[in-house]
Structures are given as C-alpha cells and as structure tokens.
C-alpha cells in the first residue's frame, strides 16, 4: 500500500483549515492506510520517532520540539483520527481503534520499530501500543499521561481534577461546547500552562480553528466519551495489570499539572520491566509547549541510552528506517 503525498495546503476531504501552520523544515503529506486518510508532518533523518499529540490538539503542538529532535532523528507527527487534517469519521474513537490507526500507519510507512513520544492522549496511545505491539516500540517517553495500571484507590483523591471533562465527554454537549464556546478551550489551555511566558495564544487559536468544524468537534467529544463511559472503569479495576509492560518507558510530568497529580504516577514499577517517573518543577500539563527543549533533551538522552544498550547486544535496532 502506497502513501499518498499531497501538497501542504490541500484541503482535507473531511475538513480542516486549508492551510497548515508553517514550521521551518517540516514536510507535510497525507497517507492513505487501510483505515483512513491521515495527515503526517515530518522532519529530519535517522531513527524514526513517532510524536503523538494530546487532546484537543494536532501535530502543531510539537512545533518547538520537532526542530530539536530532527537534528538526530526522523520525526513523524501524525494527526490522530478526527484531529487536525486527518479524516474525522463518525466512529473509531476507542483507544484500541486509535492504536489500530497507528499500527496501520507504521505498516504503510514500512516502519518495523519506532521510538514514541506521546503527550496526554498520545501518551495513553503510546502505552497501549507498547502493550499490544512491544516489538514495534523501542522506547516510550510519556508526557502528562495516565498509564494503564492506575487504580481507583490511588486516583480517587484527585478525581476532582477532572471536573472539566463533564463539559466535553457528555454526548452532544461536548461537541457544542468545543465548537461554539472557544472561551472554554482557551480556559483549559490557561489552566494547563501555569507560566504565562510560555503561553502561545496564536497556537491555541490554531487548535480552536479545527474544533469549529462540526466533524472535528464531534470527534474530540467522542474520544472523551469513549474513554469515560467505556474504558475508564475497566482500566481502574485492573484490566491491563495482567499484561506486563516490556517496553522501556519514561514518564515525564509537571508538578503543577492541573489534570494529573504526580501523586498518582508512582508505585506501578512492578508491572513493568523498565518504568521510571521524572517530575518537572513548576511545569503544567502542556510540556511540549512549556518546556520543548527539556522534552527534546530528555527524549534524546533516553533514546540514546536505548540505542547504546541495543548496540551492545549487537542486535539491529530496526529493519526499516526511511
């Protein structure tokens, strides 16, 4: 199956602004998989690194990280189903289905194994990709993400932090709020980033612009609805605990993350072969935008260690890197 390469400014058949925001050195194309048509932003050469954005963003969330990582790696930033310039069908928004999209993308790009950096929703997908296809993920840097081993007992005390999800996970209400009340989305970004100096209002407006489209507002709602109504309780009751996490994983979280307290991240090392947690002082929920240099440096340090470990074992890191 071949990738379909289109011009950066071509309008997505399912919507999306006609013009993608510009980042120096970034190439854009649309890739047709067996599941849907995905927009992918790419830069650099070397070992492939898959950057998975959070909710309710798209590839542009990585705008300051991409140039830094592209010095050492081939950086691949897809828009997830329903976000940015990727198609936004009515169905397919469960975590497992979003992971299916990523596997299909890796297949089309002929990538046998990748590094993954996932933020928030993207971090959750990175965990589930690692659990399902450990041979395809060499290492995972999870930013501001809830791992699949969370327990109700440990997370219940911080349930109040999720007050905002009621407005976006409720069917019909969520899409209406996201589409017609941009002030709510702006509020989430302000709460998520405690440092005014690193807030980029123009970037927030890029994300809001796509949410004004009915299909994408519906998609953003359904991601939240599927997780809240179908996946959260089974996860907290231990659905994934019998499955050991074999992929080396580093979790990076801000100490001032309004949505996810560091207190709920530790204590799950027994479920994994190599799982560590690091905290970023005074940082919030949007690490790729608040601390892009730190994210890139942490990723490079982590991935370099894994490459050295692989080289020492004299086993090829990947069979297909383009």
Enumerate the predicted regions with their spans.
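Catalytic active-site module of serine/aspartate enzymes centered on a nucleophile-bearing elbow/loop
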Residues: 273-322
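Generic recognition of short, well-ordered alpha-helical segments
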Residues: 60, 64, 263, 290-294
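Flexible "cap/lid" subdomain of the alpha/beta-hydrolase fold that forms the substrate-access gate
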Residues: 2-29, 35-40, 48, 76, ...
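Alpha-helical macromolecular-interaction surfaces
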Residues: 64, 71, 97-100, 104, ...
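A short, glycine- and basic residue-enriched loop/turn
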Residues: 58-59, 124, 283-284
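N-terminal amphipathic/basic-hydrophobic helices that include classical n-h-c signal peptides
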Residues: 1-2, 321
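Conserved HGGG/HGGXW glycine-rich cap/lid loop of the alpha/beta-hydrolase fold
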Residues: 41-85
């Amino acid at each position: 199956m071949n990738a379909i390469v289109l011009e950066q400014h071509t309008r997505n058949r399912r919507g999306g602004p006609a013009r993608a925001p510009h980042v120096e050195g970034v190439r854009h194309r649309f890739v047709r998989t067996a599941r849907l048509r995905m927009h992918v932003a790419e830069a650099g050469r070397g070992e492939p690194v898959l950057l998975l954005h959070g909710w309710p963003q798209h590839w542009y969330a990585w705008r300051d990280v991409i140039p830094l990582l592209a010095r050492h790696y081939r950086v691949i930033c897809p828009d997830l189903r329903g976000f940015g310039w990727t198609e936004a069908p009515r169905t397919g928004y469960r975590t497992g289905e979003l992971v299916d999209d990523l596997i299909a993308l890796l297949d089309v790009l002929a990538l046998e194994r990748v590094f993954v950096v996932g933020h928030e929703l993207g971090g959750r997908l990175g965990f589930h990709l690692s659990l399902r296809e450990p041979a395809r993920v060499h290492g995972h840097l999870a930013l501001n993400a809830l791992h699949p081993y969370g327990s109700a007992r440990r997370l219940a005390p911080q349930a109040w932090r999720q007050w905002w999800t009621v407005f976006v996970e409720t069917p019909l209400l969520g899409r209406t709020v996201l589409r017609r009340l941009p002030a709510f989305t702006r509020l989430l970004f302000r709460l998520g980033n405690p440092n005014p100096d690193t807030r980029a209002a123009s970037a927030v407006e890029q994300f809001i612009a796509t949410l004004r489209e009915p299909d994408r507002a519906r998609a953003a709602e359904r991601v939240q609805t599927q997780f809240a109504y179908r996946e959260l309780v089974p996860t907290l009751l231990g659905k994934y605990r019998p499955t050991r996490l074999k992929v080396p994983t580093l979790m990076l979280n801000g100490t001032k993350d309004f949505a996810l307290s560091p207190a709920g991240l530790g204590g799950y090392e027994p479920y994994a072969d190599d799982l560590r947690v690091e905290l970023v002082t005074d940082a919030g929920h949007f690490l790729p935008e608040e601390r892009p240099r730190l994210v890139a440096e942490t990723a490079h340090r982590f991935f370099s260690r894994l490459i050295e470990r692989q080289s020492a074992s004299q086993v090829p890191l990947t069979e297909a890197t383009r």
